[in-house]
Amino acid sequence: MSDEIARRIAQGAGRAPADLVIRDARLLDLVTGDLVDTDIAVCGDGIVGTYGEYAGTRVIEAEGRVAVPGFIDTHLHVESSLITPHEFDRCVLPHGVTTAIWDPHELANVLGTAAFDYALQAARETVMDIRVQLSSCVPATDLESSGARIEAEALRPYRDHPGSLGLAEFMNFPGIVAGDPACLAKLALFAGRHVDGHAPLLSGRDLNAYVAAGIRTDHETTGPAEALEKIRKGMTVLIREGSVSKDLRALAPLLTVATSPFLAFCTDDRNPLDIAEEGHLDALIRMAIGLGVAPLAAYRAASLSAATAFGLADRGMIAPGRRADIVLLDDVETCAVARVIAGGRPAEEALAAPRTRTPAPGRGSVKAAPVAPEAFRVAAAPGETSVIGVVPGRIITEHRRLTLPARDGAALCDLAQDAVKVAVIARHGAPGMACGFVQGFGLRRGAIASSVGHDSHNLCVVGADEADMALAVNRLIALQGGFVVAEGGAVRAELALPIAGLMSDLPFEAVRDALHPLREAARGLGCTLPEPFLQVAFLPLPMIPHLKITDRGLVDVDRMRILP
């Protein structure tokens, strides 16, 4: 170790050539906002010199490109990219994301602590620096059937793992505020460590209590007033822009040079097609600047503020002593990424090098019996029916009341009101199924089914035809998970996700290409949502207001109860 320190000192002082020099860069100083012409000297995986000229064993000519610190995605689920961590690395690192904070919550709900074992090992095999936060709420609630239950003692063996960054999104904010013993046990176990939050619309004294419990960050903030209250109370708000949850437009006015130390970026859930077409964190930076955010504020939020929020003091700036995570840009305003250096290595070379790939667990995880069309019958009730109201671009849903047609004692879909059926079928070995209605998909025919169903990942199907709903679900079971579009008694498009019913074992390019016909098939049913499959996937999430559905029934999230 002392030899390595001596090497860094010698190279930083210019007495020895640096391992790598990025020559003729324009460094965006995140302290002052200045653009400074300089070389950047790198020794091993660390920066040893800036603000001057250096000689190097290897030289990369920046040719006047702007150098910014590598981007940090502060909260994501790799599983939601539908690909393995190794493919996620190939897909996302070229977009400038050199650090990702992964909550393997989706895998954990299916596999239990085996998800942590896999995530921590896979993170050692990626070029991108992936840090794992341990899932805090498995299951999210007791209002659904999950594949696993993880209490405080099960978390203890992983707490001090060098790849573990702390406790991931604490979804059970009502439990924390009420002093639930199970919640308190987890918080006590991680006292002094980073604990990530999940507190949509929480405010006032309840928010005070939540923050006082040690919660430091939150990514479920959807409005500027909510965000301002949270940062004033000491939280860092992680501005989210994923494939479904899109909060950046609403929160961008709050992101200024003054507030940027208290705001960062995250994607949460973003699929390979959106990454290919729009980008990753580079897309968020581009969008923020396009909405009027000062470039200094945007790039600071994407790196330095994120590093500070999560205690990653070794990164977030291009400065001596920091990790050599560097992004070269052709253009600052559009965040046009030209080249990425990750831990001192050019990303394109590191990604091409042979690497170990730990096999992913979770095959054979869909343990559900086939269903018949009659299973989707919903008994008619007098008066109005509770219907889930989908809000495009949001995972918050509305609790709507509609009068639906009926025949022979059964409630029917009403296409004139855009009301179709939705069902959740348990898939972890125990029986369970619930049916209801949803408004906002625009379906005129057929069905869309998914084995991705946050957070317990039971099977979820939305459809205007019971026979097609049964066909789509049964095809999911045969595939051992995935996405299916069915119409007129035939499967129109599908993508198998055999790893825990959540991830593909294919290269990201193949998954990206498979999403095109799936979206087209969904549009062919009349679907008006830009990302129908992830929208389906959030219908069973009973921690996000206001009305959801699980395998046990419709859930009034505001009262945390199953509707009769």
Swiss-Prot record:
Reactions that this protein is recorded to catalyse: adenine + H2O + H(+) = hypoxanthine + NH4(+)
Transmembrane feature ranges: none
Highest taxon of source: Bacteria
GO molecular function: adenine deaminase activity
Matches recorded under NCBIfam families: ade (TIGR01178)
Matches recorded under HAMAP family: Adenine_deamin (MF_01518)
Name of the protein: Adenine deaminase
